């Protein structure tokens, strides 16, 4: 099923990846989600994003059941072309900018960008792709 889905969509999701509710992959071509990746609820991933491991596969038997890929907690948005690498955690309600390279843990409600990614802002107001909830109305 994984190979067939990749052929049809251009999205590669390892069968052992753990994915929460309401994952939204927008323009999914080139998205790669590695074997030990964990994705929380209400996560948005744009095109050409990699959730990849950084451990070399010299002896793959020694790496079985070892966490090598990222964890994305709830309500995270990953911009197009971003590379999230290694057994790190992107905490809740964080935003990762397009083409960023993230190799370290990201704290809750952080806005990250760059290569290597650095904190560039506070994501406390959140980000709702394609959603108008009524909360945005001017008072």
What are these regions (language model features)?
Residues 9, 14-15, 20-21, 26-35, ...:
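Left-handed beta-helix
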Residues 116-123, 128-130:
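Hydrophobic alpha-helical transmembrane segments of membrane transport and translocation systems
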